[in-house]
Amino acid sequence: MRDNLFIYLQYLLPHTLTSRLVSKLADSENKIIKNHLIRLAIKKFNINLVEAKETDISKYKSFNDFFIRELKDDLRPISNDKNVISSPADGVLSQFGTITDNSLIQAKGKLFSLESLIASSSTTSFTKFATIYLSPKDYHRVHMPIDGKLTKMVYIPGKLFSVNKITTSKVDNLFAKNERLICYFDTIIGEIAVIFVGALLVAGIETVWHGKIAPNYYKDIQTWDYNSAKFNIKFNKGDILGWFNFGSTVIILTSGNNVSFKFEENKNNIKIQVNQDLALITE
């Protein structure tokens, strides 16, 4: 009953307006406001500040600045093996596996189509997926899972439902309904996509090459082509791609048939950390 009420209230909420108001509050540099919000978040979400590069909350200029805090150096070691695909984020590996009949698993008993996720019928190259949920207590920066060159970025406006366990199990096609930013890269295994999925209270998605995109800032699908020689935007495995200004979800899509996950399929909700081995590239 409580879960159904939570879902119902989300349908009533003005998603974009709510998230933009949260964004303004989270961007406030008023010391009293931002320090109070940070203390509340640490207590409410049991945030481990010991891992942060900066542990003095007074040094963060805003609540958002705190939420995208950096980790201490070498806290998340990464494999130098080019055949290892690393986790792009701290969080919970909620679902992963093979894309079958153009469908991905959202939650137990719920599927959604790849075509609806990326808003394109050109889906034939993607064969595997992994979905990582970032809770409010997690490190919020997203890193490159494998060496690659940025070729395209697509912004798709949409709803801003919560992406927690309750909502993913109740709302059909959740990740294809929510606002999302899809980043395409050319890699040694072919094309991959790293998808930032927006959510309720997420005050924006930001990339290191483009900057911040506020919730539903664009009313239509927007595409940026980075494939020309004048851009040549390359990332090494482990490089920072961007971040969420609150908890959300990252989905990775990979091409080819030579990617094998390091976890047993049919298992889910696995705690994972950024740079941890996620999958192997096999011969």
Swiss-Prot record:
GO cellular component, one term: plasma membrane
Domain of life: Bacteria
Keyword Transport appears in the UniProt entry: no
Cell compartment(s), UniProt: Cell membrane
Catalyzed reactions per annotation: a 1,2-diacyl-sn-glycero-3-phospho-L-serine + H(+) = a 1,2-diacyl-sn-glycero-3-phosphoethanolamine + CO2
Active site: D90, H143, S248
Name of the top EC class for this enzyme: lyase
Modified-residue entries (Pyruvic acid (Ser)), positions: S248
EC number(s) on file: 4.1.1.65
InterPro entries per record: PS_Dcarbxylase, PSD-B, PSD_type1_pro
GO biological process: phosphatidylethanolamine biosynthetic process
Membrane-protein topology: Peripheral membrane protein
Cofactor: how bound: Binds 1 pyruvoyl group covalently per subunit.
Single GO MF annotation: phosphatidylserine decarboxylase activity
Residues the record marks as site: Cleavage (non-hydrolytic): G247, S248
Main location: membrane
Associated pathway: Phospholipid metabolism; phosphatidylethanolamine biosynthesis; phosphatidylethanolamine from CDP-diacylglycerol: step 2/2
Cofactor(s) the protein requires to work: pyruvate
A Pfam cross-reference name: PS_Dcarbxylase
Keywords assigned by UniProt, alphabetized: Cell membrane, Decarboxylase, Lipid biosynthesis, Lipid metabolism, Lyase, Membrane, Phospholipid biosynthesis, Phospholipid metabolism, Pyruvate, Zymogen
Posttranslational mods: Is synthesized initially as an inactive proenzyme. Formation of the active enzyme involves a self-maturation process in which the active site pyruvoyl group is generated from an internal serine residue via an autocatalytic post-translational modification. Two non-identical subunits are generated from the proenzyme in this reaction, and the pyruvate is formed at the N-terminus of the alpha chain, which is derived from the carboxyl end of the proenzyme.
Record function comment: Catalyzes the formation of phosphatidylethanolamine (PtdEtn) from phosphatidylserine (PtdSer).
Subunit structure: Heterodimer of a large membrane-associated beta subunit and a small pyruvoyl-containing alpha subunit.
Family: Belongs to the phosphatidylserine decarboxylase family. PSD-B subfamily. Prokaryotic type I sub-subfamily.
Name this polypeptide is given: Phosphatidylserine decarboxylase proenzyme
Organism: Francisella tularensis subsp. mediasiatica (strain FSC147)
